[in-house]
Each structure stands twice: as C-alpha cells, then as structure tokens.
C-alpha cells in the first residue's frame, strides 16, 4: 500500500516538472527558428505601432502637463517628424534640443555606413530600427519641451494658414456684394427702359425685394440665410438681362450724373440736419437735470430762512486757496467742487466760490446743504444780487450776433469782473463748469507770474486738440484790429486759469474789457462769446502754464491719448458734447462720472444714471 502511494507521488511530481520544463524548451526552439527576415517583419510591425501611437502619446503628455502650461510657444515641425524647430525663450532648452538632434544625425550616419557592408535583408532591419530610434529621439525632444511648458500644435500648411486669415478678414464680403447688387438694381430701375421691357423690370423688382428681405440689417456673412447664394445668382441673371436692354450709353451717363448730384444733395442736407440737432441737444437742458433742479428748489423753499445758509467760513482770507466757478448746472458745479477737494492734499485750506444766477441759486444752495464738502469751505453767490455788473451790461450781451443762450448769458461774461466780485482777494483760480480736477493744484499758488495777469495753457500749436488761431475768431481785416493786435499771436484756453487780481486792478483791465466788448458788438469785429474778447483784453498779459495743467478736447472728437488725459491736472470738456448730455463721448464720460453720486435719492428719482 505504501509502495503504491510512493509511485503516485513520483508520477505527480514528474508531471509537474514536465509542465514547467516543456514550455521553456518549446519557446527556446521557436526563437531559434526565427529568421532574419521574420525578425525584420516583427520590428516593422513594432515600428508601425510606435508611429501610430506617437500622436496619442504626445496628446497624453500634453493633457498631463496641461495645468502647468501658461502660454503656448511657437512650433514648426514636419509631417514625418524628421525635424523639429522650436521657438522658446530659454536658450538652454534650445541647445538641449539641438544637441539631441545632432547626436541623432551622427547616430543615423553611423548606422548608414554600417549598413553598406550588410546583406539587404539586414539593411532592411537596420533601417526599420533606425526609424524607430528616430521616433524615440523625437518623443524625448518633445518631453524636454513639455518640461519647459511648451505646447505642441499640429502642423499646418501655408495654404491652410492663408485660407484661415482670409476667412477671418472676409466676414462681410458676401453682404457687401449683395448690397452692391441692390444698389445697382435700384439704379437700373430709376432709368427709363427703352421699348417694352415690363417683364424685365418686374423680375428685377422681385429680385431686389428678395435680397433686401434676405439681408435686412445683417452685417456678417454668417448671419445670412442659406438661400442667399441662390438669390444672389438670380439677381445677377436679372441684372445681365437689364444691361442688355440698354443701348444708348450717353443717355444713361447723363441720367447717372443727375442721380449722383441728387444723392450728394441729400447727403449734404442730412449733415446739416445732424449738425443742427447736435447744437439743439447741446443747448437743451436734459429732462433729468431739470427734474433735479425742480426738486431741489422745492425742497429749498420748504426750509426755514435761517437753515438756508451754509455755515459762515473765512471766505475772504487771502492766505487760503480760493477757487471760483460760474455755473447754472447743479451736477456740473458739484463735480468741479468734489473733484478739486478730493484731489487736494490740503482740503482744509480750500475755499470754493460757486457763482450762479437767481433762477438756479436755490437748487445749487440746496444741493450743497444736503451734500457738505467736509473740511473745505463753500460759498454760494447770486450774481444778480451783486452790484458789480453795469446796468447796461445785459443790453450789450443781447446785441451779440448769437442766439445761443450759453453765449449771451451773464454768467459767461461775469469772469471779467473778478476783482470787483472778490475785492479782498489777491489771487484766484477760475474754473469752467465743464472741467474735472485730477491732481493737487497747490503748486499753482507758488508760481511767479512775472507781472502777468492770467496764467493759462497755450493753444497755438497746430495739431493740438484745442488748437485755435486768432484770425479764426477775430476780423483782422479791420484797420484798428490789425494795427493793435498780431494775428499770429499765441492763443490760450479757458477752463482753468490763475488770475493775479492785484495786477488786474492796477492795469484796470475790466475797463479795457468793456471798451473792447462795446467795439466788437458795434463793428462785428469778432465772434460772439467770451474767448475772443478775453484774448484781446489780456493781450500781452498771459503767463504760459505747462500743458499738463489743463488738457482740453474732451467735448469733441479730438483723438486725445488716454495717457495725456490721465496725467493732466485738469481735463476740460470744451465743445458741445458735454459729459452730462446724451451726446457726450462715452470714452471721456467716465472721468466725469466717478465724481457724480448716482446713488443719491434725488438722482434716482429723476432717473439720472451712469
């Protein structure tokens, strides 16, 4: 019994040993039987697998390193990956890739030399192995670039790039072509067709309406309906038929000239109408501002008399910084005051004088009562209650050759009475109400004006956004004007001006202003407004300030650079496109809007928004 069991164990162990040794012997014999050609076929299959999976490996590597990629680098590579040219900001990475490519080329040359002494079958195997090694070297080069945060892009031919650029640029060519055909068709319809061609005219009208419905207000080709190409072809056929119906070319040329003249006249009329509407919008008070003024005026008269006055301050202290603005606009005067105070390094030394008329005095007073300025002092003055203007001044203003209420306003010319309005002051800075202060103006008070009366930024350089010449405002054909003044003299701008009131009083320039103003009204020697008569009154009395103190041109399309605006101490919205009007220029409005409290309840109720 024990003998039987022993034989069973021996048999089982023998079978186990045979099952282990048999595969080893079989595989070794199989490997020995593989010929060189079979080995070449095997390597070729392996190389094909490597080539097929190369792009997949590259994409997988990019996905794994995607979070580290911040900016794509430019790459130019061949389709068969025989060469790789990489644009990288790192010289070190470039040297690494180039050295790898050089080693690779040397390796390939050595292999080629060795293959010359081998049989053809072995050379085939070597070539396949070389291609596989080439692919491996390229993959290693890509790994290096991926480590340097370089993104690989699939190669694109030159024709593909040109096509892509053309598609990006020509996004409205089809729309323009359709509109040209419509214009051409309408021109033919306006011409008298010879003979009996009613069918052609009918077809042309139908095609025109079809294209007009297809295009509508479309400006891009991608928004055109799919039927537009067919309709365009039908229009071209109709235009060809119509063109063959005309034989009298001189008559057609005459008709087209008449149509051109009519179109030009219509364009000129449209321009005149647009200019008139712009001027009308500039002179009209916006509904929101009118609502705000009415609400503030009503609230002002509901207050007790003793509560209507601002706290009395040192309004006549000559050691403080005095600023003045003449305005009938609540928001405009508020922006001037707020921007000046917020930009100042010493707001407690600022005294702001806001001069207005009787109509707007309650509203402006109520606004500053509701919105105190903090440490700065504010004084609201009514020009109609001050006995500084001559009794006949209003009559002189009405004689100006202008219907613009802004020009004939008493506030516009009250600036020429500054020494009389502020008899206790020696210096003062005058603002127009369409300015915004962006820098501290303390340095102005320490300027030595060398005996001049007014400090201003000059505007006599051609190409300057605020360029003006004397002869464009003043009639130098008059003998008296040409003898006393120089037409080539440098002009200067209002907006922000520093006045030496002591020197003004000494030279009695207010009397000079009244004399010149009366002469100008009687003889029509210059354009209406305060600027021409101001140039003549202060002729030879101007101290030039640096340009950065006052940058103008924000009230019209002047092409100002953003850097010039942001570096300016004061920006001036000279022109009709004021920032509080709907016609204001959006890119310039933002400098004004930041000083307007649009969250204020009164502005919300009057629908005044940013």
UniProtKB/Swiss-Prot annotation:
Please explain the role this protein plays, according to its UniProt record: May be involved in pectin and/or xylans biosynthesis in cell walls.
Q: Which PANTHER family match?
A: GALACTURONOSYLTRANSFERASE 4-RELATED, GALACTURONOSYLTRANSFERASE 5-RELATED
Protein name, per record: Probable galacturonosyltransferase 5
Pathway field of the UniProt record reads: Glycan metabolism; pectin biosynthesis
The source organism is Arabidopsis thaliana (Mouse-ear cress)
Q: Give the gene name.
A: GAUT5
Q: What is the lineage of its organism?
A: Eukaryota, Viridiplantae, Streptophyta, Embryophyta, Tracheophyta
Q: Which GO terms describe its biological process?
A: cell wall organization; pectin biosynthetic process
- Single GO cellular component term: Golgi apparatus
What is known about the tissue distribution of this protein? Expressed in roots, inflorescences, siliques, leaves and stems.
**Protein's cellular compartments:** Golgi apparatus membrane
Q: Enumerate the glycosylated residues.
A: 88, 94, 196, 338, 401, 475
Q: Disruption effect? A: No changes in the cell wall content.
Composition skew (Polar residues), residue ranges:
86-101, 124-135
One Pfam family from the record: Glyco_transf_8
């Amino acid at each position: 019994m024990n003998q039987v069991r022993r034989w069973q164990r021996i048999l089982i162990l023998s079978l186990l040993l045979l099952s282990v040794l048999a595969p080893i012997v079989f595989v070794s014999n199989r490997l020995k039987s593989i010929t060189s050609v079979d080995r070449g076929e095997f390597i070729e299959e392996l190389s094909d697998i490597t080539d097929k999976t190369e792009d997949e490996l590259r994409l997988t590597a990019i996905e794994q390193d995607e979070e580290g990629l911040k900016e794509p680098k430019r790459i130019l590579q061949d389709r068969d990956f025989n060469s790789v040219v990489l644009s990288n900001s790192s010289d070190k990475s470039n040297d690494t890739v180039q050295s790898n490519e050089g080693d690779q080329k040397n390796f390939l040359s050595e292999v080629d030399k060795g293959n010359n002494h081998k049989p053809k079958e072995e050379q085939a195997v070597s070539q396949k192995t070389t291609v596989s090694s080439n692919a491996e070297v390229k993959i290693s080069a890509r790994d290096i670039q991926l480590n340097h945060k370089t993104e690989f892009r699939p190669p694109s031919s030159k024709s593909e790039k040109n096509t892509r650029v053309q598609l990006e640029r020509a996004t409205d060519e089809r729309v323009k072509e359709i509109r040209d055909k419509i214009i051409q068709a309408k021109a033919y319809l306006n011409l008298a067709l010879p003979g009996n061609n009613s069918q052609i005219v009918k077809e042309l009208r139908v095609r025109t309406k079809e294209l007009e419905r297809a295009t509508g207000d479309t400006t891009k080709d991608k928004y055109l309906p799919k039927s537009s190409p067919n309709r365009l072809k039908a229009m071209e056929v109709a235009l060809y038929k119509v063109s063959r119906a005309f034989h009298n070319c001189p008559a057609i040329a005459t008709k087209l000239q008449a149509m051109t003249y009519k179109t030009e006249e219509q364009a000129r009329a449209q321009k005149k109408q647009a200019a008139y509407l712009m001027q009308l919008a500039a002179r009209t008070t916006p509904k929101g501002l009118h609502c705000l003024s009415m609400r503030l005026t009503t609230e002002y008269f509901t207050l007790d008399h003793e509560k209507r006055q601002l706290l009395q301050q040192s309004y006549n202290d000559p050691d403080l910084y005095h600023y003045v603005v003449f305005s009938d606009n609540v928001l405009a005067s508020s922006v001037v005051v707020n921007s000046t105070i917020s930009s100042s390094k010493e707001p407690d030394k600022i005294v702001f004088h806001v001069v207005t008329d009787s109509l707007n005095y309650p509203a402006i007073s109520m606004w500053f009562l509701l919105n105190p300025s903090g440490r700065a002092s504010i004084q609201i003055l009514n020009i109609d209650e001050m006995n500084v203007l001559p009794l006949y001044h209003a009559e002189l203003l009405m004689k100006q050759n202008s219907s613009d209420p802004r020009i004939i306003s008493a506030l516009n010319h009250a600036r020429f009475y500054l020494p009389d309005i502020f008899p206790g002051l020696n210096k003062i800075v005058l603002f127009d109400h369409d300015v915004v202060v962006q820098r501290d103006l303390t340095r102005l008070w320490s300027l030595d004006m060398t005996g001049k009366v007014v400090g201003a930024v000059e505007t006599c350089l051609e190409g300057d956004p605020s360029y003006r010449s004397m002869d464009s405002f003043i009639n130098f054909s008059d003998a008296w004007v040409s003898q006393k003044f120089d037409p080539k003299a440098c002009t200067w701008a209002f907006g922000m001006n520093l006045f030496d009131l002591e020197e003004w009083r000494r030279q009695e320039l207010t009397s000079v202003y009244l004399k010149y103003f009366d002469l100008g009204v009687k003889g029509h020697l210059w354009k209406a407004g305060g600027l021409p008569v101001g140039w003549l009154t202060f002729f030879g009395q101007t101290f030039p300030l640096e340009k950065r103190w006052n940058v103008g041109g924000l009230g019209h399309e002047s092409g100002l650079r953003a850097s010039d605006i942001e570096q300016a101490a004061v920006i001036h919205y000279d022109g009709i496109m004021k920032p509080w009007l709907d016609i204001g220029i959006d890119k310039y409005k933002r400098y004004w809007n930041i000083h307007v409290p649009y969250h204020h309840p009164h502005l919300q109720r009057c629908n005044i928004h940013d």
